[in-house]
Amino acid sequence: KTRSYTNKMVLKKIYKALEKSPKFELIELPFIDVTEDPVRPELSLEFRQSHGRKIYGIRDEEGDIAAVMCFAFTHDIPKSVEEMDAMSRDAAMQAIHRAGVQGTIAIAYTVWAKKKGGGKHMVNEVYKMIKESNHLSRLVTLSPLTDMARKFHLKNGAKEVQVNLTTQNFEYNIELSEWEKLKGKVTEKWRNTTWSIK
């Protein structure tokens, strides 16, 4: 009886591992209904798209937007929306002289899920995008001072940077892990290997 139970548990784990995980596509959104934003509905669409700021969404397999995240790009960590506005304007002006490269820090100032689990998948997709970026080195939030925001970011792997008067900042570590560094070295070495057939 114990053996049968153990076999069932092993099979259950195998089935779970083989289950198809949902696929998402990160896309830049040209339009959103800002009134749907539960975090910062007061920020206009124009604000979210000016001075190099961007709006991203993740599209699920059904073609629906599962979550939305808005970004500003800066060189420092802002403590308020007003500071973020000024910093992203400054980074946008500097980008004119740097072939369009704007800011080294992606500031996620609002995120919301339109479908269950969308927020977590949004963080994962943005994490991948920033990790693959040539000029972004950090992913930091400008979150409201709520327990819900704190729990969400800590649960998804962020570290608290600072608590401000009206906001709090969390940072997602986007440095390559040791495994990823080793994988990169092995891949590069393999590409540079001359193969000969004898």
Describe each PLM feature range.
Residues 113, 140-151, 164-171:
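Conserved beta-strand-loop-alpha-helix junction that forms the acyl-donor binding cleft
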Residues 113-131:
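Conserved acetyl-CoA-binding loop-helix of GNAT-fold acetyltransferases
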Residues 154-164:
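Conserved acetyl-CoA-binding loop of GNAT-fold acetyltransferases
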Residues 166-198:
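C-terminal "cap" of GNAT-fold acetyltransferases
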